[in-house]
């Protein structure tokens, strides 16, 4: 009321278009949601202004510095650049009736989704996931897997998960697929899971124990703001007790960043959400390096798209052959592990007379150039062709 804020306009661009959107619109006040890596990226582009309003900083001081090991504030030289307005974890949603109908085991961990048991119905997919270029939350899940299992094994697990499922155009579409029973499982950010449990009985959110992380979802002031005082007043309200009540709405189901909101009359009506809050707090997360994730952000996204989504049919064909031979007893455990790793290990290809491998270091070396689009079409073509050749070679070697 003090700043006469009577209306808000929201823009929700694809995550890879945030930079272009901020530049094109020119007078956006606030960046909100999307995860820490995206916000740290905005900081590196010089788009984020420090939050310096004393009243707002006083409310920020009421927010814990971390939750479950995850930072809830980002400072640079003592200046606050973003503060979390909500908490997220990352796991998957299970449609229990479909799981039972299809005779699939109940998954608890990421590697369960990459198991041959989830490939028994191929080419029918059992898992929904989004292309990382279309979803920051699913991008985070792929980054979690890579950091939990290491670069090479992480990609091998992601490959099998991708083969067991199918790529969707976004996280909402993947969510709809598990809710409708089109698939048995969808990877997801937590609040999709909590909302699904309320709206679609029979669905359940699973947080993989010691295999995930907690994120603080940021809100920040942009340098393009033409109303910085009003913008900071909005930030102040969002992280206040009253503002945090919006997450309690059963149509929203987000995890508040303030525990004291659960002590309000509205909060006492959500013992289910408070139980999830405490379960998330108690879950042992993995050590996660935001800077590492940021250093391979574009490389990871575009590699995934080219290798697992663009040539998905061939990936499924190769994995299905491995699964069938293994489950039919035509392949030993040792042979299965060999072929399962061969399917998804980082690709190698010839470039300028040299053999190049998609190592972590190589991904970091081309990341910025991919982000600007400079090398994008070149490597998308190289990766698609190399992936297609690998899958075809596996099919031929296994007599497919």
Question: Model segments located where?
Answer:
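Early extracytoplasmic/lumenal segment of secretory-pathway proteins
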Residues: 1-40, 175
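Ligand-binding pocket segment of bilobal, Venus flytrap-like solute-binding proteins
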Residues: 12-15, 20, 144-206
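A structural signal for short loop-to-beta-strand junctions that line the ligand-binding cleft
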Residues: 18-32, 36, 48-96
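Ligand-binding "clamshell"
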Residues: 42-51, 78, 196-208
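Periplasmic-binding protein-like
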Residues: 61, 65-66, 157-161, 199-223
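A bilobed periplasmic-binding-protein/Venus flytrap-type ligand-binding module shared by bacterial periplasmic
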Residues: 93-98, 214-228, 246-247
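Mature extracytoplasmic/periplasmic domains
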Residues: 222-291
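C-terminal non-catalytic accessory extensions
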Residues: 322-400
């Amino acid at each position: 009321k003090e700043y006469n804020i009577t209306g808000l306009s929201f823009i929700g661009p694809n995550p890879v278009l945030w930079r272009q959107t901020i530049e094109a619109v020119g007078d956006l006040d606030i960046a909100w949601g999307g995860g820490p890596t995206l916000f740290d990226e905005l900081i590196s582009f010089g788009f984020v202004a420090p939050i310096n309003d004393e009243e707002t900083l006083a409310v920020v001081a009421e927010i814990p510095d971390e939750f479950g090991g995850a930072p809830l504030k980002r400072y640079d030289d003592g200046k606050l650049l973003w503060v979390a307005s909500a908490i997220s974890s990352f796991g998957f949603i299970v449609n229990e009736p479909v799981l039972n109908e299809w005779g699939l085991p109940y998954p608890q961990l990421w590697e369960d989704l990459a198991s041959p048991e989830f490939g028994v119905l191929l080419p029918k997919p059992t898992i929904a996931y989004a292309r990382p270029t279309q979803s920051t939350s699913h991008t985070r899940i792929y980054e979690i897997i890579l950091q939990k299992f290491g670069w090479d094994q992480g990609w091998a697990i992601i490959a099998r998960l991708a083969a067991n499922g199918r790529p969707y155009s976004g996280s909402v579409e993947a969510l709809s697929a598990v809710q409708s029973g089109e698939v048995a499982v969808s990877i997801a950010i937590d609040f999709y899971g909590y909302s699904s449990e309320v709206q679609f009985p029979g669905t359940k959110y699973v947080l993989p124990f010691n295999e995930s992380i907690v994120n603080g979802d940021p809100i920040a002031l942009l340098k393009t703001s033409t109303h910085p005082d009003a913008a900071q007043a909005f930030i102040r309200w969002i992280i206040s007790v009253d503002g945090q009540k919006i997450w309690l709405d059963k149509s929203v189901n987000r995890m508040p960043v303030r525990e004291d909101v659960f002590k309000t009359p509205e909060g006492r009506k959500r013992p289910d959400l408070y139980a999830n809050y405490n379960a998330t707090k108690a879950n042992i997360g993995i050590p996660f390096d935001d800077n590492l994730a940021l250093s391979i952000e574009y490389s990871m996204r575009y590699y995934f798209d080219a290798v697992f989504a663009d040539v998905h049919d061939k990936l499924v064909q190769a994995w299905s052959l491995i699964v069938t031979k293994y489950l039919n007893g035509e392949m030993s455990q040792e042979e299965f592990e060999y072929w399962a790793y061969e399917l998804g290990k980082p690709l190698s290809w010839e470039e300028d007379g040299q053999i190049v491998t998609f190592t972590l270091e190589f991904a970091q070396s081309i990341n910025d150039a991919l982000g600007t689009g400079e090398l994008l079409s070149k490597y998308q073509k190289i990766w698609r062709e190399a992936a297609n050749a690998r899958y075809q070679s596996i099919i031929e070697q296994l007599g497919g």
